[in-house]
Amino acid sequence: SAVVTEAQPRSRWLSWSLRWSWRDFRAHWVAVIAIAFVLAIGTGVYAGLGSTGEWRRQTNDASFAALEMHDLRLTLSPGTFIEQGQLLGAIESIDDADSVSAAAERLVVDSQVDTGSLGLADSVLVPARLVGMTFGSDRPVDAVWIRAGTAPSAAPADRSAVLEVKFADEHDLPTEGTILVSGGREVTYTGLGVTPEDFFYEGPEGTIFAAGELAIVYLPLAAVQDISGNEGMVNDAVITLVDGADRDSVAAQLDAAVSELGVGATVSTRDDADAVRVLYEDIDNDQRFWNA
């Protein structure tokens, strides 16, 4: 009897509380639903933005891996060139040569691009970077992703090019056409694309938003050698390493090997590339902002 008597007030209180809540809900149902809706949106947004860092990191990893972003890069001192094949020879000569998965020589030179020959209403004359590289390789390093059009073939006589896609978008340029580079040389580009190291890049004099201020043109190595007057010469090499390789040790060996060639060079890692540094730093910075 004591138990029943003690439970009845609790039961009556619960019943009264539910009736009062129901009456209050009916009187303020619009506000209640609005508050619930706002809370649901806030919870969903926080959960979504709170996890952006991980999927952005995974996306970056996949993008760099798909285009075989270099692990190490050899860059000769400005204005220095060396005979094609010598950098590859230096790479093959190091003690840990078996740690190298693939390597490619390049010729990277400054130039200018004039879009006036495209016949558009507006044309631009901007600083440019010509990247002479190998197309159609079975073991590419820093391959070109083609968004539209086609890339040059592996044929020695092919002198077509790929125009960097962000520059083309900034100036609303067509997928293919003919542009002029320094010396009035015509270059026919057949596609728009980008290499992984140019996912982000600085423009002239270190400008950050450089998409429209620097034209990057990817051409076969022989084409850039011809255009720049550096026949048979290179000044750059990019390298990928096998899984588990000691990157720092390989870099030190490469530095010593290139020094023996009698030229000044810088050995940099993929982490030194603007694209890698900025894109990954942005992840952490943005995540801290969303978390705040």
PLM features per residue range, with description:
Residues 1-292:
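Membrane transport/envelope proteins' first extracytoplasmic loop
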